[in-house]
Regions:
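C-terminal boundary/linker of central alpha/beta nucleotide-binding cores
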Residues: 1-35, 46
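Extended alpha-helical scaffolding segments used for macromolecular assembly and cargo binding
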Residues: 34-114
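Alpha-solenoid helical repeat architecture
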Residues: 62-63, 73-74, 112, 149-159, ...
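Amphipathic alpha-helical segments of tetratricopeptide repeats
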Residues: 65, 85, 102-106, 137-149, ...
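Internal alpha-solenoid helical repeat scaffolds
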Residues: 108-283
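Linker/hinge segments immediately adjacent to helix-turn-helix/homeobox DNA-binding domains
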Residues: 338, 364-384, 388-395, 404-493, ...
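Recognition helix of helix-turn-helix DNA-binding domains
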Residues: 505-544
Length: 554
C-alpha cells in the first residue's frame, strides 16, 4: 500500500508492467541510501542481512553478495558463490573477489568445499593459476578434515576437483578428457560447481576458434571433440551440449562447404533447443550470420529481435558476445555505421572479459578498425593479439589477425610485408583447407592474390579468388537489401539511385543534371518506381508517400 501511494504521488517511483516490481529513480535511491546511513550500525546490519536474503532467494546473486559483503557474512557469501556457480560472479572485477577471499577466515572457507571449487574455476578464468592451485590444496584439506562428509560425497568432490583441474589443460582436448574420465569414475552425481545453464565458451562467439590448436590437425581435433564431449556431458548434466556439432559446422564453413555447414548448424540448433545452452546458441547465431552472407538461409530472428531477447535475460555476458558477432558481421560487410557501440566506439576496456575469450574479442575489434580504415591501429594492435593467441594455442584466431595485419600493410603501401604475411597465412591455412578468413577479407587482398606463391596449391588460391568474388557480390546485394525497405527489392540499381536523390528533395531537373540524363528519362524512371511500388495518387502525393516509405527504412 505504501508503494502504491508513493507511485501515485511521486514521479521518482514507477511500477513496471508486471504490476509487482517497482523502479526507483537513482536520485531517490541515493537520498534513501543517505537516510539509511544515519541508522546505527546494528540496524543497518539487520537490513543488509534482509537485503542479502531477499536477493539470494530471487537469484540476484551479485546484489546478494554486495549486501552480505557489507555485513562481512562470509558464510552467506560462500553459499551464494556456490549457488551462482561462477556465472554472474564472472562479471565482477577479479580484485573485488580476491579482496573478499583474502578476508574470509580459512575455517569458514573449509566449510564450503563446493564454493572453493567455483572459486578455483574463477581463478582460471582470470589467469590467476597460483591462487587456483592454492585453493585446490585448501579443498583437499577440507575434504580430509570435514567430519560429516560421506565417502560417496568425498568421491564426488574429488571428481569435481579433477573436472576443474581439466581447465589447466585448456584447449588440448585429449588431455582435458583424461581429467573428465577420471572425474566420471569418482562421481555418482552431476557436478554442482558447474551449472548446466552457465556459459561454456568463456565469452567466445566460436567453438572452433577455441579448439583449433594446430595447423594440419583440424580433422583430428574434430574427431577428439566427438569422442570426448560425451564424458564431459555425463558429469556436468549436459553443460555445453552441442559444442562438437557447432564446431563441425564451423569447420565446414571455414572450408567453404556451405551446404554441409548449414546442415550441421541446424543439427546444433536442434540439439540445444530448450536446454539452456545460451553460449552455444550464440555460437550458432554467429555462424548463421556469416553463412547468410554466402547462401540464402532464413535467420531465426532479426539482429534486433535476438538482442532484445538476450537483454531480457539480464546477463551482460550474453549481450556482449552477441554484440561481438554483430560487430564482425557489419565490419566484414562494410556496414560500419551499424556496428554496436561497444566495438564501433572501441569501449572493450570497460568490460571484464574472461581471459580465454579476450583474444576473440580483440580480433573482432581489429576487424572493426580495419573496416573503419584505421590501418595503423590494426598494425599497432596485432602483435599483442597474436601473442595472446599463440599463448593460448588459438591457431584460427591468429590466422584471422595475420590476414587483418597483411590487409592493413597492403593498404598503407607496405607491399613486401603484406606479401610475406600472405605467404605465411596461406601456408598456415592450406593443410586444413581453411578458406573463409581470406574470403571475408577479399576486398582488401584481391590485388595481392593475383601474384604467384611458390609451394601453395593453385586450386586452393583459385577457390579463394572465386569465392571471394562471389562473396563480394553477395555483400553488395545484402547492403542494398538492408539499406531499403523490403518492398524496394523490385527496383533496379538506377531506380534506387534516383529514389535516393528524390529523398534529398532534388527536382527532376537537378536529378537529371546529377546523373547526366535528360529530364524525360528521369521522369520515365520515376513513373516506373511509382508503378513497381504500387504508389497511387497525383504526382505530389506519390512523391510524399515515397519519401515516407524511405524514412520508414530506418
Amino acid at each position: 500500500q505504501i508503494l502504491k501511494t508513493l507511485t501515485r504521488q511521486n514521479a521518482f517511483v514507477t511500477c513496471l508492467n508486471d504490476g509487482q516490481t517497482y523502479r526507483f529513480h537513482h536520485m531517490m535511491k541515493e537520498c534513501a541510501f543517505r537516510a539509511f546511513r544515519t541508522l546505527d550500525d546494528s540496524r543497518q546490519a539487520f537490513y543488509y542481512e534482509r537485503y542479502g536474503a531477499w536477493y539470494e532467494k530471487h537469484g540476484a546473486y551479485i546484489h546478494a553478495l554486495s549486501a552480505y559483503r557489507r555485513n562481512q557474512n562470509f558464510a552467506a557469501i560462500l553459499r551464494v558463490v556456490q549457488k551462482d556457480a561462477g556465472i554472474l560472479l564472472a562479471s565482477l572485477k577479479p580484485e573485488e573477489v580476491l579482496e573478499v577471499l583474502n578476508r574470509c577466515p580459512v575455517s569458514v572457507l573449509k566449510e564450503y568445499p563446493l564454493a572453493i571449487l567455483v572459486l578455483m574455476r574463477c581463478m582460471f578464468n582470470w589467469k590467476n593459476i597460483p591462487k587456483m592451485l592454492e585453493l585446490k590444496e585448501l579443498l583437499l584439506a577440507s575434504i580430509r578434515e570435514h567430519p560429516k562428509l560421506s565417502e560417496e560425497e568425498r568421491g564426488n568432490l574429488l571428481g569435481e576437483c579433477d573436472l576443474i583441474q581439466s581447465f589447466l589443460m585448456y584447449n588440448d582436448i585429449s588431455r582435458m578428457s583424461q581429467f573428465h574420465r577420471s572425474a566420471s569414475e569418482k562421481m555418482t552425481r552431476p557436478a554442482i560447481s558447474i551449472r548446466s545453464d552457465g556459459g561454456w565458451t568463456f565469452g567466445s562467439p566460436s567453438v572452433l576458434m577455441m579448439f583449433h590448436r594446430k595447423s594440419g590437425d583440424l580433422d583430428k581435433e574434430l574427431e577428439e571433440m566427438n569422442q570426448c564431449m560425451p564424458h564431459y556431458y555425463k558429469i556436468t548434466n549436459g553443460h555445453g551440449q552441442g559444442a562438437e556439432t557447432i564446431m563441425s559446422a564451423e569447420a565446414h564453413f571455414m572450408r567453404g562447404n556451405f551446404v554441409d555447414a548449414h546442415i550441421a548448424l541446424e543439427k546444433a540448433y536442434t540439439q540445444i533447443q530448450g536446454n539452456g545452452q545460451e553460449s552455444i546458441a550464440l555460437c550458432c547465431d554467429f555462424l548463421a550470420q556469416r553463412l547468410s552472407i554466402c547462401m540464402d538461409i532464413k535467420m531465426r530472428n532479426t539482429f534486433e529481435e535476438r538482442r532484445k531477447e538476450l537483454l531480457q535475460g539480464h546477463n551482460t555476458t550474453w549481450v556482449n558476445i552477441f554484440d561481438s558477432t554483430c560487430a564482425y558481421y557489419y565490419a566484414v560487410t562494410g556496414q560500419t555505421e551499424r556496428i554496436p557501440t561497444l566495438f564501433g566506439a572501441h569501449m572493450l576496456s570497460t568490460v571484464n572479459f574472461l581471459a580465454p575469450g579476450r583474444p576473440m574479442m580483440e580480433m573482432i575489434e581489429n576487424q572493426v578498425y580495419l573496416a573503419q580504415g584505421e590501418y595503423s591501429k590494426v598494425i599497432g594492435r596485432s602483435e599483442s593479439i597474436l601473442a595472446m593467441s599463440q599463448a593460448l594455442h588459438y591457431d584460427l584466431v591468429a590466422l584471422h589477425v595475420q590476414i587483418q595485419l597483411l590487409a592493413a600493410n597492403w593498404k598503407l603501401g607496405k607491399t613486401e610485408q603484406a606479401l610475406d604475411l600472405l605467404r605465411r597465412s596461406l601456408s598456415q591455412a592450406f593443410p586444413d583447407g581453411i578458406l573463409m578468413p581470406f574470403v571475408e577479407n577479399y576486398p582488401y587482398i584481391e590485388e595481392l592474390l593475383k601474384g604467384s606463391f611458390f609451394g601453395i596449391n593453385e586450386n586452393f588460391l583459385f577457390r579463394i579468388t572465386r569465392m571471394g568474388k562471389e562473396w563480394e557480390m553477395r555483400c553488395d546485394q545484402l547492403k542494398k537489401e538492408e539499406a531499403y525497405p523490403p518492398v524496394f527489392k523490385v527496383l533496379s540499381d538506377r531506380e534506387l539511385e534516383i529514389t535516393e536523390l528524390m529523398a534529398k528533395h532534388m527536382s527532376n531537373k537537378e536529378i537529371a543534371q546529377s546523373l547526366f540524363l535528360s529530364e524525360g528519362t528521369v521522369k520515365q524512371y520515376i513513373n516506373q518506381i511509382y508503378s513497381k511500388l504500387q504508389i497511387p495518387g497525383d504526382v505530389r502525393v506519390k512523391r510524399k508517400y515515397l519519401l515516407e516509405m524511405m524514412e520508414g527504412k530506418s
